[in-house]
C-alpha cells in the first residue's frame, strides 16, 4: 500500500490528497507520476525517521525520473539520509550529484561544507594540520557557493569564513 494512504497525520493526508489530485489534473507522463509517488513516499518515511524505507523509495524514484531539477532533489534527500546515518562519503557523493543537475541548490553546498568542516576538525584532533587545512579550504569553497546563492543565509558560515580569513 502506498505510504500516502497510511499516514495518520491530518496535514499529511490532506497533502497526499492534493498531490494525488494534481497528478491526475496536470499532464504528466506515467514515469513522472511514478517518480513523484516514490519521492512523496520517501519524504513521508524520512519525516518519520524510517530512513531505510525512505532510501528505498528515493532509489526507486531515480529510475523513472529524467528531469534534472526534480532528480536533484531526490539525490539531495538521499544525501541527507546518508548524512544522518554518519555515512559522510556517500552523502558527499549524493550532494555532488545533486549539484551537477541543479547548481542552484545552496542547501547541498552548505551540507557539503558542514561535512568538510567536520572532517577538518577531526584532522585537527588527530594532529594532522595539513589535512585539516585542506578540508577547511574545501568547506570554505562550498560555503562561498551557498552564500553566493542566498546571501542572507548561513550567517554562522559567513562568520567562520571571516574569522578564518577565508572570506573574500
From Swiss-Prot:
Q: Which family does it belong to?
A: Belongs to the Ycf3 family.
As for what it does, the entry says: Essential for the assembly of the photosystem I (PSI) complex. May act as a chaperone-like factor to guide the assembly of the PSI subunits.
User: Pfam families in the record, alphabetically?
Assistant: TPR_1
Q: Where are the TPR repeats?
A: 35-68, 72-105, 120-153
In its UniProt entry, what is this protein called? Photosystem I assembly protein Ycf3
So which domain of life are we looking at?
Eukaryota
GO BP terms: namely: photosystem I assembly
Q: Where in the cell is it found?
A: Plastid, Chloroplast thylakoid membrane
Q: Does the keyword RNA-binding apply?
A: no
Spell out the HAMAP family in the cross-references.
Ycf3 (MF_00439)
